[in-house]
Amino acid sequence: NLLSEEGLNVIGLPKTIDNDLWGTDMTFGFQSAVDIATQTIDCIHTTAASHNRIFIVEIMGHKVGWITLHAGIAGGADVILLPEIPYDIDKVYKAIDKRTKDNKGFTIVAVAEGAIPKEIAELPKKKRKEAIANNPYPSVAYELADKLKAYTTQDIRIAIPGHTQRGGSPDAYDLSLIHISEPTRHS
């Protein structure tokens, strides 16, 4: 505000792959991250199908699940779990069991790294924070896999593309955003 009062035009260029900034249509890097996560899910289809496995693909998104949602839909995940909607392990298993009964043989679960089980989400805020901080699992994918083992003997594998979602070459959409914004940037 102070700069604009001095006659300087100021704009903000959002730099987060999470696409979680209010007032923006799309943040820089979001679509590239979605493409990488989608490719991961797509590549896993073959091995999941040929070995009748449950694959849990953990995707970036600690507080919001936009990358997981878009990649899960585009990549053809069978179950998508987001931080905004606490999951019920019974419902996750029922979706897997239905696929088994329908002779699908495999299931791909796309889960955002910030997804939490319903029973944790229902705790009072202080207890919820403690439960999350004291979680013995290295990540949500491992917790989910361990919980699903109580329901099934089907082989469960985990794939975590991790920081590859933040790196690499930007896709055409993100390159367009970069080039469109170029005249507004100063060195």
Language-model-detected regions and their locations in the chain:
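Short beta-alpha connecting loops at secondary-structure transitions
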Residues: 19-25, 127-132, 168-171
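A contiguous binding-surface segment within folded domains or other stable secondary-structure elements
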Residues: 154-160
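Accessory alpha-helical/coil subdomains and C-terminal extensions
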Residues: 9, 30-51, 58-154
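Short, ordered loop/turn segments at secondary-structure junctions
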Residues: 8, 13-20, 84-87, 113-116, ...
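N-terminal glycine-rich phosphate/adenylate-binding segment common to multiple enzyme folds
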Residues: 1-7
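Short glycine/threonine-rich loop-to-helix capping motif typified by GTGT followed
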Residues: 121-124, 168-176
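Acidic/polar active-site rim loop that often engages polyanionic ligands
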Residues: 13-26, 49-50, 74-75
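Single conserved hydrophobic/aromatic residue that forms the stacking wall/gate
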Residues: 178-187
